[in-house]
Amino acid sequence: MIDDITVEELKQKIDAGEKFVFIDVREPHEYEEFNLNATLIPLGTLPSAINDLLPHKDEEIIIHCRSGARSGSAKITLTQLGFTKVRNVLGGALEWQRLYGR
């Protein structure tokens, strides 16, 4: 299993223009309040989105939520389904906002 990623590492990847699949598993109201331009797939809808994600099965997928708990669950789900490079953002959106603001 691939290591999780810190907010600082995520910001470096974004700033460098690196390619990865970026998913936000929070709820729509949380996404509207603040987001990092990730694709919104609320955790409860993740099972129905699996087919859309299958083409990215062997690509780096970075998942975040508010604090890291829901994205941790999403990482486990995708890893169990054979996705090979799934990373959870440690601290999530709260840590991003603490370090970098909105």
Regions found by a protein language model. Name each.
Residues M1-V21, V25-E60, R66-R102:
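Rhodanese-like catalytic fold shared by cysteine-dependent sulfurtransferases
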